[in-house]
Regions:
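Terminal amphipathic alpha-helical/low-complexity segments used for targeting or macromolecular assembly
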Residues: 1-106, 171, 177-178, 182-196, ...
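Structural signal for interior beta-strand "rungs" in well-ordered beta-sheet cores
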Residues: 43, 102-312
Length: 350
C-alpha cells in the first residue's frame, strides 16, 4: 500500500541517521529488500543480505553505519539499529488510527465504571467499579471484569479478557483472545478426585506489556498476592504464565513457551518457542532458553541453556554433535568387540 511520498532526508532526520545518496529521493511504501521496487523503503539488518544491495530495486535502504553504497544502487540511510528504525518508520507510514472516545450502543458498561476518554466497541462488557484510562481502545467482545484497573492508551483487541480485580498498566496491548487473570491450575488430589483450590489472588501487567493472541496469564492463588509481568515484556501467541509467577522487565516469551506457577524470571529473559520453566524456579537476569527446552534448575544471570533438561548451550551443542555420531560409534564398537573376541579365541587355542 502506497502513502504520501516522503523525502529520504526527512526520514533520516527523524531517525537521527545519515544519508548516503539522494536526500531528495521520495519513498511512498515499505517492502522487503528482495521484492522492493521503485519508491520503496526497506532495511538491511543482517549482513548476510548485503549482496542484495546490488540487486534490489528499492529507492532507499536502512543500513548499519559500516555498510558502503554500491554503484547505481539505492540511497542508504545509515542508522545504529536498522531493524528498530524500520519499526519506527512502519508505524509512521502506516499508523493505526484509534477511534474517537465513546461507548457503542451495544456495549454493556456498568453505571459505576469509569471509561472517560475511552472507546468501547460493540458487545464489550465493562464490569462494576472497573476503571479504564483515557485513550484506551476496547474492541468488540472484550470483557473487563468488576474492579479491574487499566491504564491510559491501552488496546484490548477482540474477545480479550481482563478478569475481576486484575490490573493493566499504561499502553498495554492484549491481542485477540488473550486472558489475564483466569484461574490458576490448582487442585488437591483426594481419594475421590481433585479438589479445586480457589484462586483468590490477581494478575498484574506493568506498562508497555504486549500479550499475543490466546495467551494466558493466570491469577495467583492467595488473597493479596499477584502474578506479575514486568514493564516492557512481550509475550507471543499461545503463551502460558502460571499462577503466582513473576516476570521481570523486558522478558520475551515466544509461542508455546510457558512458566509454571511461583517461578521467577529476571529482567530481559528470553524463552524461545516451546521452552518451559518448571514451577518454583528462579531464573536470573538475561538468561536465554533455547527452543523446546525444559528448565529444571535455577539459572544464574546470563546463562544460555538448551535441551531437556536444559544445560549449558555449548555443552548441549557438543552433546548433540556426539549424538549424531552414535550409529558410527556403535558400529565401531561392534567391530572392536568382534576383533577382541577373535583375539581371545586365538589366545585360548595357543
Amino acid at each position: 500500500m502506497r502513502v504520501a511520498p516522503r523525502p529520504v532526508g526527512d526520514i533520516a532526520q527523524e531517525l537521527g541517521g545519515d544519508v548516503v545518496g539522494s536526500a531528495q529521493a521520495l519513498v511512498d511504501h515499505i517492502a522487503g529488500i528482495e521484492n522492493a521496487g521503485a519508491g520503496a523503503l526497506t532495511f538491511l539488518s543482517n549482513r548476510r543480505y548485503v549482496p542484495h544491495l546490488a540487486t534490489t530495486q528499492a529507492t532507499a535502504v536502512l543500513v548499519h553505519p559500516g555498510i558502503e553504497p554500491v554503484p547505481n544502487g539505492p540511497t542508504l540511510i545509515r542508522v545504529t539499529d536498522p531493524y528498530a528504525a524500520f519499526a519506527r518508520v512502519l508505524a509512521w507510514m502506516y499508523p493505526r488510527h484509534r477511534p474517537s472516545a465513546g461507548v457503542h450502543p451495544r456495549a454493556v458498561v456498568a453505571d459505576d465504571a469509569v471509561v472517560d476518554g475511552v472507546f468501547v466497541d460493540a458487545l464489550a462488557v465493562v464490569g462494576a467499579g472497573a476503571i479504564i484510562g483515557a485513550g484506551s481502545w476496547i474492541e468488540p467482545g472484550v470483557v473487563v471484569g468488576a474492579g479491574a484497573r487499566i491504564g491510559v492508551d491501552a488496546h484490548l483487541m477482540a474477545n480479550a479478557v481482563v478478569a475481576p480485580g486484575c490490573t493493566l498498566g499504561d499502553r498495554v496491548v492484549l491481542n485477540p483472545g488473550a486472558v489475564v487473570g483466569g484461574d490458576g491450575f490448582g487442585f488437591a488430589p483426594t481419594a475421590t478426585g481433585h479438589e479445586k483450590i480457589p484462586q483468590r489472588g490477581s494478575a498484574t501487567l506493568a506498562d508497555d506489556v504486549e500479550v499475543g493472541s490466546n495467551s494466558c496469564i493466570d491469577r495467583s492463588a492467595l488473597p493479596g498476592t499477584t502474578t506479575t509481568v514486568g514493564p516492557g515484556s512481550k509475550l507471543d501467541n499461545l503463551v502460558q504464565v502460571g499462577h503466582g509467577a513473576t516476570l521481570g522487565r523486558g522478558v520475551r516469551m515466544v509461542a508455546y513457551s510457558g512458566v509454571a506457577g511461583s517461578s521467577t524470571l529476571g529482567d530481559h529473559v528470553t524463552l524461545a518457542a516451546k521452552a518451559a520453566v518448571l514451577g518454583h524456579r528462579t531464573i536470573g537476569d538475561g538468561v536465554a532458553v533455547g527452543a523446546a527446552s525444559v528448565v529444571h534448575d535455577a539459572q544464574p544471570d546470563g546463562a544460555r541453556v538448551t535441551g531437556i533438561p536444559a544445560i549449558n548451550h555449548r555443552t548441549w551443542l557438543r552433546a548433540a554433535t556426539a549424538f549424531s555420531e552414535l550409529p558410527n560409534v556403535l558400529r565401531a564398537l561392534r567391530d572392536l568387540r568382534r576383533r577382541v573376541k577373535a583375539l581371545e579365541e586365538a589366545r585360548d587355542h595357543e
